UniProtKB/Swiss-Prot annotation:
Listed name of the protein: Probable transcriptional regulatory protein MSMEG_2940/MSMEI_2866
Gene Ontology MF terms in the entry: DNA binding
Family, per entry: Belongs to the TACO1 family.
Record's GO cellular component terms: cytosol
The keyword Transcription regulation appears for this protein: yes
Keyword Transcription: yes
Major site of localization recorded for this protein: cytoplasm
Length: 251
């Protein structure tokens, strides 16, 4: 029986991982479709589309899926949805601020799913503007270190508008104004430095430190929100201390 139980558990875990992978693929595909619709279907002349395609490739999205999404967005192939960007605001456990970015073809469904995830996981919705002011929209480029120093990266991107370079351990994070994002990633390319992703992102201006139990609750809420097909990104102003992060890694 124990062998069967272990097999069943393994099978369940694989199903969960496969489901998460499928949802991630769908979100990356949506980004490609929208980028092509907004800026045109040529990645060479549309940096947002180029980055969306590269991100999908690095996440092992099949090339056929990528190309079909590009064509749908560019109007070269039928079937493109009318995607709308909507941002919802709320508070999670411990008073942590939460921003939820949705890309949906059904506003009512998206709002309902976000509300349910919030209320079932210790959160609540907030009025527009009551949470957003705690965050700033920034350009964020991430890259593996691969032997590079912080000075190497700074030298490449400083004149392109980079505001800061953060050392994340195995990787670097470059922060800029969203309007300088293309210039920063272009500067990296010209310096022969490969990067993992280049996205506009919300960065918290004020953070809320949490203990282990608080971190668990907020992460559970984030998981529930990200489980919605309409949700593209979830941002919080939670600050997880190093000792708490180490405990979470062990779980």
């Amino acid at each position: 029986m124990s062998g069967h139980s272990k097999w069943a558990t393994t099978k369940h875990k694989k199903a969960v991982i496969d489901a998460k992978r499928g949802k991630m693929f769908a979100k990356l595909i949506k980004n490609i479709e929208v980028a092509a619709r907004v800026g045109g279907g040529d990645p060479g002349g549309n940096p947002t589309l180029y980055d969306a395609i590269q991100k999908a490739k690095k996440s092992s999205v099949p090339n056929d899926n990528i190309e079909r999404a590009r064509k749908r967005g560019a109007g070269e192939e039928a079937g493109g949805a009318d995607w709308q960007n909507i941002t919802y605001e709320g508070y999670g456990p411990n008073g942590v601020a939460v921003l939820v970015e949705c890309l949906t073809d059904n506003r009512n469904r998206a709002a309902g799913e976000v509300r349910v995830a919030m209320t079932r996981n210790g959160g609540n919705m907030a009025d527009p503007g009551s949470v957003a002011y705690l965050f700033s929209r920034k350009g964020v480029v991430t890259l593996e270190k691969n032997g590079l120093t912080e000075d190497d990266v700074l030298l490449a991107v400083l004149e392109a508008g980079a505001e800061e370079v953060n050392d994340l351990g195995d990787s670097f994070e470059i922060i800029s104004e969203p309007s300088d994002l293309v210039a920063v990633r272009t500067a990296l390319q010209e310096a022969g430095i490969d990067y993992d992703s280049a996205d506009a992102s919300f960065q918290p201006s004020v953070t809320v430190p949490v203990d282990l139990e608080g971190a668990r609750k907020v992460l559970k809420l984030v998981d529930a929100l990200e489980d919605s097909d309409d949700v593209q990104d979830v941002y919080t102003n939670m600050d997880i201390p190093d000792d708490v992060a180490a405990q979470l890694d062990e779980e």
